[in-house]
Amino acid sequence: MVSHRLTRFRPLRSASTKDAAGQASVPEPPAHMRAIVFDEPGAAGVLREDTVPVPTPVLSELLVRVIAAGVNPIDAKTRSGAGVYGALSDQPHSLGFDFSGVVVSTPYESHPLPPGTEVFGMTAFPRSPGSYADYAVVPTLAVARKPAALSHVEAAAVPLAALTAWGLVVETAHAHEGQRVLIHAGGGGVGHFAVQLASYFGAQVIATGSATNLPWLRELGASVVIDYASTRFEDVVGTVDVVIDLIGNVHDDTGTRSLSVLRPGGLYILVPTGAWPGYADAAEAAGVRATSYKVVPDGSVLATLARLLDSGAIRVFVDRVYDLAEAEAAHREIERGHTRGKIVLSVSDC
């Protein structure tokens, strides 16, 4: 699936070796694998299962056997010709940015993640998706050991969404005690992590969502929950320090209305930017700060998230699981919206 790679290598730690601690051996990968691909952008029906060569990693990458792959809105947008479609170069195009699986080969001896290690992480975002497949090549610095408390299906639901939430809540909003944070779409993949992280770091969380998700959002840590269908949030939230907007102006001018509840100098954070191209000018006119955020794959942050997940400080919710061959149905589901937590593809048995 991955082409145009300039430096290839024969892995020094092969799938048939054991480490000094007796790391279980991993079967050598086959020459070919199953993968979900598409030739031209379009509706979910353009997705198809194909047999393609197992990818060859470069010196900074691991080869992993994918056990489960997360499905994200960016996947469906990219398939339709939006999202990060312009960054793709391979033909046919692959999809899938996050995964959980097992290391098959490493670029050098004494690698901290030897063959047989259970890991979770991201492929090279945005240029090289590929987790909708039996095997994937992934940047060494974009993976971490899988949380021991999670199944592979649960772990595959974490990387892209939780890393995005961490970037929003911790690195951009700098969530802290006494801060009031409004999070739109708190029940989605990114949203349910953002609610938990903001609450964990001491912020007072106000979350919007569907009526059926409101009790669950309270369980996740939101102190105020708002049914977006029946209540205009600006009528009840008062003034907030930060708005994390996972909707933008796609629905009911949510972005524009959010600016009115921010304190002077407050911070508006938009994901994704395409949902409201004029957000920066509107924020300046309203006397508030504004920025956008795009996920950065980071294994060290994933390791921190793994510790939080293992301790029970945060949790992941998987709404539905589809087989790899059902990727089309998974895309149709995520495009319908109103998902609670994440959708995951089950790629292989452990």
Describe every region a protein language model picked out.
Residues 159-227:
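Mid-domain Rossmann-like dinucleotide-binding core that forms the NAD(H)/NADP(H) cofactor-binding site
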Residues 9-10, 17-29, 40-67, 90-94, ...:
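A short N-terminal beta-strand-loop micro-motif at the entrance of redox/enzyme domains
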Residues 235-242:
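A short acidic, Gly/Pro-enriched loop at the edge of an enzyme's catalytic core
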Residues 88, 122-185:
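NAD(P)H dinucleotide-binding glycine-rich loop of Rossmann-like/cofactor-binding domains
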Residues 4-23, 28-31, 301-350:
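C-terminal hydrophobic helical "lid"/dimerization subdomain
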Residues 249-314, 346-350:
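Glycine-rich phosphate-binding loop and adjacent beta-alpha segment
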Residues 53-71, 83-125:
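Glycine-rich beta-strand-centered segment in the early N-terminal region that forms part
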